């Protein structure tokens, strides 16, 4: 079994330090105190220019849970398109509906837009009403490459 050491960071300094200390991959966020938000574009660009290991970018427009309005989804799509333009390794995202079920429609739409980037569903699944049921369904989506829980 291959163990991949992924480090979640919210600064360029932490990303460089993680790489120097043996991280295999970075999950780049902002506001880790809010469980991670989409980082600023400039941080994404600088981190990509300084690191040699794969970078996956958190796509989460606000820290008030995982339910998103259309304006939030538009911001998420814009962030995904930006990440695609920079050839990051992947994006990390997740959506819930108003009843705290994993929103497969929104996730599938975002994952399809993100192609060919890797798409990882994040901790939103932990807040869903049916973690196991959600997991079993989400892994059937061919555009989803993994789940972080």
Residue spans for each PLM region:
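Ordered, amphipathic secondary-structure segments that act as subunit-interaction surfaces
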Residues: 78-95, 99-102
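Glycine/Thr-rich beta-alpha phosphate-binding loop at enzyme active sites
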Residues: 93-101, 137-149
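Active-site mouth loops of central-metabolism enzymes
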Residues: 1-11, 59-77, 121-131
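N-terminal pre-domain/capping segments
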Residues: 1-26, 31-38
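Active-site-adjacent beta->alpha loops and helix N-cap segments on the catalytic face
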Residues: 12-16, 32-53, 70-74, 95-115, ...
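Conserved, mostly hydrophobic/aromatic
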Residues: 18, 47, 83, 110, ...
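Glycine-enriched alpha-helix->loop->beta-strand junction motifs that scaffold or abut catalytic
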Residues: 19-26, 51-54, 87-90, 113-117, ...
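Hydrophobic faces of well-ordered beta-strands that scaffold small-molecule active sites
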Residues: 3-7, 26-28, 55-59, 91-93, ...
